[in-house]
């Protein structure tokens, strides 16, 4: 057998997988996945049977209910979705190497006969609001719109939910929260505003930053009320105080937040359609939104009538061709992003008349693991890890802003550096155990041994850590002016993760106002069109601070949902 269908048909009939009429159930393949589970068990049950494997692919870090067909195809060779981000060697039966041959929005515009046939037909569905993208912004918008009385469809072009949000690890920035007060952390929306503007080199839109900072506490409260654990509060680069909220023990915030959002969307019976791509925002003769043309992977083109459309499609950091055109210095860089982050939403918005801004500002995350392609959260540094070069020397304030940290790493021998930490840092942040499990964090019982393993000058490394520990004891980093010195590195084993910058966040995007309404080049609102999250520009300026992305997507997602629902009621 060359594929799963050929294998299954040796012992079973077609209707073991398919509906009796042979038609695919929907673009989410709901029926087909139910049949998979009926034979093989749930993802959790399968993960238990494969736990002996070095990389247990079924023990997924993805939120939501990951469908079997996210990786396993039937009538063609399968592709391991993990390989879209990582470079692990999975040996899956009937599989081929990961590839993404997805036509662009412009290329799809050439499907004129199919598109015109769909548009000439009656709408497939009629709702109040369509949300495009199932990341943190999309789910927040869908839930918020639903709670405001709107009927909502949420579409997602990938086979898995979560967008980039599911990969976020550091925290959710918010000011003057109950969690901060409980830890006696003094903060304010004004200070968060100042930090965000400074981090963005004051290119940010102050009005949008004010929305972000002044509503950040409400966003944390909103998530907490829905079941999120955001009790741990850490520090991220560019912040004056600890304001990065995350789960107890320092677990990754993104997957947790998306899981909470997903669970709440399910409770509200929100219509979620996977493998479904937003193609064109439809407008009437007056330029007002009347719906959206979509393309299902299996069902093809159809249109949905809606009063409002919310674009929450993320950025374009995975599209290196587009990145390099805007910033040639990033040509050939790998990305920390999920495979869908190629800029579809920007094309859809532009075709609808939306203006783009700040497109030239593209951020590299300083710590992408050289082995495995795993983004290592900034919280590792925030909790005490140091950065050293191959010569075993520190060379930068570890929790400076990402642009400065990335530039400093690229200036080192080999254009990479090493995160060095001990068991005390590991115990403070449960996310680190994931890196160890993935094999990207070698360990040794001495710094000399660790240096030998990783090609670092062990003698110099030992001296560097001793020097750093003395600075921790003194309470002041006179070498690089690191503002926080949470702990000495002298407990148990030592760890090293080789890291290099990877394209991480695209600060530019669709121009929006303080109601999340998309605007044209004349700064006029396009009635019924909204944007939230990384698809938009103006919030972060020239550089995004760690922890501000989750805050951004939740805050503006909520806002877009509320405003779209209000707009729908009026129309």
UniProtKB/Swiss-Prot annotation:
GO CC annotation: what is one?
outer membrane-bounded periplasmic space
Keyword hit for Heme: yes
Q: Which residues bind fumarate?
A: 377-378, 402, 504, 544, 547
Binding-site residues, heme c 2: 8, 36, 39-40, 94
| Amino acids binding heme c 3 | 52, 58, 68, 71-72, 91
One GO term in the molecular function aspect is: FMN binding
* Annotated residues for binding of heme c 1: 14, 17-18, 74-75
Chief localization: periplasm
Top-rank taxon: Bacteria
| Catalysed reactions, semicolon-separated | 2 Fe(III)-[cytochrome c] + succinate = fumarate + 2 Fe(II)-[cytochrome c] + 2 H(+)
> Where is region (Flavoprotein-like) located?
118-571
UniProt-annotated binding residues for heme c 4: 61, 82, 85-86, 431
Outcome of mutating residue 378 to D, per the record? Answer: Strongly reduced affinity for substrate. Reduces activity 10000-fold
> What are the subcellular locations of this protein?
Periplasm
Q: Kindly summarize what the UniProt induction comment says about this protein's expression.
A: By anaerobiosis and fumarate.
What outcome is documented for mutating residue 365 to A in this protein? Reduces catalytic activity by over 75%
How is the subunit organization of this protein annotated in UniProt?
Monomer.
What this protein is called in its record is: Fumarate reductase (cytochrome)
Taxonomic lineage of the native organism: Bacteria, Pseudomonadati, Pseudomonadota, Gammaproteobacteria, Alteromonadales
